[in-house]
């Protein structure tokens, strides 16, 4: 039986996918698998028996990926499971920036005791007038699951949409509307677009990408939307641009003291994926990925190990080896197994950066002696008997 610990409340729809072979427990130290949403794991001691961490969501900056990789702990996420929920809020944010609905609502609240509020509204409403998005230019930076949905929806709203992503996947490209203009240089988006929305992961190369230099290349009165990661924007630079009028509105899903309550900022309390549907979808996907890995050793949607799928093992045994991505590892594995007079019926080796993952189906059950011999090979992080 596999024991699973939840560091955050996880949707019952997802947990209901667990079979009788699984038990949800309160103590992470006894768990083979961990399900997490936003809880930080950076300061946690990871138990030796922990095999997998599944993030019910896309972002994994709350998980120590390198530390997990070195311990042979596979970290999964759920890309695309919350894409529609985030997309809808991005579109809502864009509409709120185009027309001062928030300001109008606040005026109504402040005027609640005015018996002639309807008459007063006719005089005051011009203060909250805005523009329509139809015919405007939207730049989408990052054409992953969310970016593609935002771009396609904006096309249906009658916007002229430009997309930038030098690493766009084949699947994303197939799903992208033909009406979206794919640009090869992000500065084309900066120069031409009325609205710019960013949908990229937080990396060293993307941190603070929306800064003073980037903003200087944008159209006057541009609207910036950030529903991806808070640190993608240098918000001090954004506030300076708001004061000068270079940026008309900054819409963010990440509340913090820098932008909260600032003129021109529409700050939402991190509601992007906070829908029942998104939480259910993320939980189901996270649970299914973890189950396939724990039961079969297959890796799908990992952020620290390569994808690998050998289906269900039909042989007597299956071994998974986590190791450095260096030469001569496979030769050493097969030599050790051969010395034990065990035949290998199938084998898969995949690498990702500095780490690699090898699965071997063998015609005899794996012995403790075999596991220890493989573990002694220099460069091996972990040896796991899957079956």
Give the residues covered by each predicted segment.
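Rossmann-like adenosine-cofactor binding region
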Residues: 42-44, 166-260, 274
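Phosphate-binding beta-alpha-beta segment of Rossmann-like dinucleotide-binding domains, i.e.
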Residues: 79-137, 301-303
């Amino acid at each position: 039986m596999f024991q699973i610990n939840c560091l955050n409340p996880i949707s019952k729809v997802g947990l209901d996918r667990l079979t009788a072979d699984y038990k949800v427990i309160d103590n992470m130290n006894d768990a083979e698998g961990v399900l997490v949403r936003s809880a930080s794991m950076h300061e946690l001691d990871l138990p030796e028996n922990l095999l997998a961490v599944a993030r019910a969501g896309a972002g994994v900056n709350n998980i120590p990926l390198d530390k997990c990789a070195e311990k042979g702990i596979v970290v999964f996420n759920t890309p695309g499971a919350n894409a529609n929920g985030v997309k809808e809020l991005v579109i809502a944010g864009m509409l709120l920036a185009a027309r001062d609905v928030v300001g109008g609502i606040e005026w109504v609240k402040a005027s609640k005791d005015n018996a002639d509020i309807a008459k007063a509204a006719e005089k005051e409403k011009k203060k909250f007038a805005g523009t329509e998005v139809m015919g405007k230019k939207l730049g989408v930076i990052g054409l992953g699951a969310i970016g593609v949905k935002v771009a396609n929806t904006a096309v249906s709203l009658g916007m002229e949409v430009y997309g930038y992503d030098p690493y766009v996947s084949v699947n994303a490209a197939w799903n992208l509307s033909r009406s979206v203009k794919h640009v090869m240089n992000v500065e084309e988006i900066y120069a031409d677009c009325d609205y710019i929305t960013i949908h990229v992961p937080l990396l060293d190369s993307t941190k603070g990408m929306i800064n003073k230099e980037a903003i200087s290349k944008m159209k006057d009165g541009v609207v910036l939307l950030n529903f991806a990661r808070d640190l993608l924007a240098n918000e001090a630079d954004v506030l300076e641009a708001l004061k000068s009028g270079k940026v008309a509105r900054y819409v963010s899903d990440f509340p913090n003291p820098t932008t909260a309550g600032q003129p021109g900022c529409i700050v939402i309390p991190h509601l992007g994926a906070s829908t029942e549907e998104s939480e259910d979808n993320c939980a189901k996907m996270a649970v299914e990925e973890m189950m396939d890995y724990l039961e079969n050793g297959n890796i799908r949607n990992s952020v620290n190990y390569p994808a690998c799928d050998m289906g269900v093992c039909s042989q007597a045994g299956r071994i998974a080896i986590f190791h450095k991505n260096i030469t001569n590892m496979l030769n050493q594995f097969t030599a050790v197994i051969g010395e034990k007079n065990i035949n290998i019926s199938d084998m898969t080796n995949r690498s990702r950066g500095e780490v690699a993952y090898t699965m071997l189906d063998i015609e005899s059950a794996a012995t403790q002696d075999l596991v220890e011999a493989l573990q002694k090979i220099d460069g091996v992080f972990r040896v796991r008997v899957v079956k």
